[in-house]
Amino acid sequence: MANALAQLKSFTTIVADTGDIEAIKRYQPEDATTNPSLILKASQIPEYAFLIENAIEWAKTQSHSIEQQIEDAGDKLAVNIGVEILKLVPGRISTEVDARLSFDKQRSIDKAHKLIKLYKDAGIDKSRILIKLASTWEGICAAKELEQEGINCNLTLLFSFAQARACAEAGVYLISPFVGRILDWYKKDTGQDYTAETDPGVVSVTEIYNYYKQNGYNTVVMGASFRNIGEIIELAGCDRLTIGPALLEELANTDVEIIQKLVATPATQSAPAALTEEQFRWVFNEDPMAVDKLAEGIRNFAIDQGKLEVMLKTKLS
């Protein structure tokens, strides 16, 4: 019998949730995803020093302002790492817009255009890029405009059905509903332990997946943020799953039969009218877990972006 990872690949597109090139070589995923925390982690790998130096030297040619140089170097480093990863994966790389822009639609769009241009200058077509945006109302609206321009987006930090529905209604290419962080919240809130089947994160992704298929939405569902392989195995059949290196290794070393749990069924109903902004904000606000985890996720990505910029500022000085 093939290992669990090999079996999973027959049901689901496997994506590596890492900026570590060695891990990507080892597990041969279809796509890869990065975020500010992963870029910060990758920047500390000695083999990546040349990518940082290239970003620093490029930024110095773009502006005399140290603040602008720091911003430019951060963008260029994210793209440099993405370019290296694209040499190893046949599919796409997800590169994230600065989390501090999560409530600014226009600046998110502008940042996306900048990232796409940096990739283009490096010889990478936009068809291999997914622009990652937080699933705020502003992020979803930015994604809607970018999708209309032919720039595909990955809406991340997604914790609620309201966010998922709004993304589908906006015509977003892909969503990343988080599994493990939902579990974290419920374990802390209730004091309970959960099986893989009753895991609130697994239940959430399953509900979103079934809703999309039943209503004929084309938005790709990519489960993310896993705490254990039980969650992953329970979502076998999801369009895509983005998995960190430690859990990829555990799956590769696990011999257990994988059964497809999520199965796409033909659309059985027409989609409802799109949520208005007021409806979205109210329904989202009614979910305390989603409110807490979205805010926390944005804060933590912003903190790691800040740490990265401190490192870049030191090198620019």
Swiss-Prot record:
GO MF terms, alphabetically ordered:
transaldolase activity
Q: Name one GO cellular component term.
A: cytosol
> What organism is recorded for this protein?
Shewanella frigidimarina (strain NCIMB 400)
Q: Which family does it belong to?
A: Belongs to the transaldolase family. Type 1 subfamily.
Subunit structure, interactors included: Homodimer.
What EC number(s) does its UniProt record assign? 2.2.1.2
Q: Say yes or no: keyword Ligase present.
A: no
Where it sits in the cell: the answer is: Cytoplasm
Described by its record, this protein's role is as follows:
Transaldolase is important for the balance of metabolites in the pentose-phosphate pathway.
Name this polypeptide is given: Transaldolase
Which positions are catalytic residues?
Answer: 132 (schiff-base intermediate with substrate)
Q: What is its main location?
A: cytoplasm
What metabolic or biological pathway is this protein involved in?
Answer: Carbohydrate degradation; pentose phosphate pathway; D-glyceraldehyde 3-phosphate and beta-D-fructose 6-phosphate from D-ribose 5-phosphate and D-xylulose 5-phosphate (non-oxidative stage): step 2/3
Keyword set, alphabetical order: Cytoplasm, Pentose shunt, Schiff base, Transferase
The reaction(s) annotated as catalysed by this protein in its Swiss-Prot or TrEMBL entry are: D-sedoheptulose 7-phosphate + D-glyceraldehyde 3-phosphate = D-erythrose 4-phosphate + beta-D-fructose 6-phosphate
Q: Which SUPFAM superfamilies match?
A: Aldolase
Q: Does the keyword Signal apply?
A: no
What single Pfam family name could you report for this chain, choosing any that match? TAL_FSA
Q: Name one GO biological process term.
A: pentose-phosphate shunt
